[in-house]
Amino acid sequence: VLISLPKRDTDKPSNVTIRGIGGQSLAMRPQVRLTEGRLPRPGSAEILAGQSVARRFAGAGIGETLRFGMRDWTVVGVFDAGSTGFSSEIWGDADQLMQTFRRQAYSSVIFKLSDPSAFDAFKARVESDPRLTVEAKRETRFYADQSEVMAKFLRILGTSLTIIFSLGAVIGAMITMYAAV
């Protein structure tokens, strides 16, 4: 979920991603480590802030309070996710966040198979179950698909600007040559 929070220095709002987590979330992400404070208690209005969020946004430091989803949330921990995008997120109890944002179902579930080569069999079994409406993807594929739309937009924008500026340069050169003659 995206929320808007004011930045510390400018007070201008900027978007921040909120992610619901469970008890094993840090174990699932070995690159993420708690640097300050503690993990949120399940069922509470406590959150973890990524280092980037804690540093850049008002109210996102440890012990501070953020208001979103018509509720006050206390930052009880700060985590470092290295150079990943997770450092720009806020994490809280998944069930509490689902209630706050009136979500009826999880948008994604992340888990680790004991044998990575069993993924294809797992995918076939889950996707063929008529009770479920899911699409199983490896996490790397999920994020690649997410960024593909933006990459396509940027390619089209870049090509369009290149053509426009090229035409402008050609016309400018023609006008200059005509004026010189």
Label the model's feature ranges.
Residues A151-V181:
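Hydrophobic alpha-helical transmembrane segments of multi-pass inner-membrane transport and secretion
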Residues Q24-Q31, A49-G63:
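Short, solvent-exposed hinge/capping segments at secondary-structure junctions
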Residues L2-P42, V75, W91-A94:
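The feature marks short, hydrophobic/small-residue-biased sequence motifs that occur predominantly
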Residues G23-P30, R103-V109, T162-G168:
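Short, basic, helix/turn surface patches
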Residues D11-I18, R29, P42-E46, G61, ...:
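Extracytoplasmic
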